[in-house]
């Protein structure tokens, strides 16, 4: 019996209260990005914001990232949870997305909660290279570690598994600064 993520408990409580939020898609019935999605991409590009993919489908991700990079000139893209079971991207998929300038996000909690084997996370990071990776924690829920503790644990694991201190800094600091327009 797996422990539910913190947010899943909220969704279940809302359902019990009769509150529902139907799923939405960024694609129309023809598989094209909706007009509303294009408007959001225009805003992201205009203000040099970061586009993240969240938990959307692979079909949506590839359509979104292609349009963001090619049609809207979005410069800062993160593919969220690339090694999470429901949003899992192969290294081949990640390389295609990186061709659009996207960074791949790996979260401490994904392997720490045994949703993926750490060796898989490590293999993906090595295949992509630190220049295409951002690491985060996905922590902050009231029942878990503090985010800084998770980041320290992830950085330490990467260092112990052969990444240099500079490579770890690239994945934990420099790539994020670049995405934020601070470099």
Task: Provide a role label for each language-model segment.
Residues 1-34, 154-155:
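Active-site gating loops and adjacent loop-to-helix segments of metal-dependent hydrolytic enzymes
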Residues 36-49, 161-165:
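A structural motif corresponding to the C-terminal end of an alpha-helix
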Residues 42, 47-116, 134:
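Catalytic pocket-lining loop regions of alpha/beta-barrel enzymes
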Residues 51, 104, 138, 168, ...:
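Divalent metal-coordination and catalytic microenvironments
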Residues 62-67, 88-94, 114-125, 143-156, ...:
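Histidine/acidic-residue-rich catalytic or RNA/ligand-binding cores of hydrolases
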Residues 70-75, 128-129, 160-164:
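Short helix-capping segments at alpha-helix termini
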Residues 130-147:
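Short acidic/histidine-rich active-site segments
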Residues 150-152, 156-183:
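Mid-to-C-terminal alpha-helical segments outside catalytic/metal-binding sites
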């Amino acid at each position: 019996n797996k422990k539910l993520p913190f947010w899943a408990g909220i969704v279940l409580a809302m359902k019990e209260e009769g509150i529902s939020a139907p799923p939405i898609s960024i694609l129309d019935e023809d598989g094209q990005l909706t007009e509303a999605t294009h408007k959001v991409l225009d805003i992201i590009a205009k203000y040099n914001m970061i586009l993240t993919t969240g938990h959307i489908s692979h079909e949506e991700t590839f359509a979104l990232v292609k349009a963001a990079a090619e049609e809207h000139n979005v410069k800062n893209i993160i593919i969220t949870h690339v090694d999470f079971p429901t949003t899992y991207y192969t290294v081949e998929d990640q390389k295609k997305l990186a061709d659009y300038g996207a960074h791949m996000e790996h979260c401490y909690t994904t392997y720490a909660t045994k949703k993926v084997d750490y060796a898989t996370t490590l293999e993906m990071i090595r295949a992509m290279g630190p220049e295409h990776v951002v690491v985060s924690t996905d922590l902050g829920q009231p029942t878990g570690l503090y985010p800084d503790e998770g980041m320290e644990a992830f950085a330490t694991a990467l260092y112990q598994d052969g990444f240099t201190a500079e490579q770890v800094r690239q994945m934990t600091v420099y790539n994020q600064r670049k995405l934020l327009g601070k470099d």
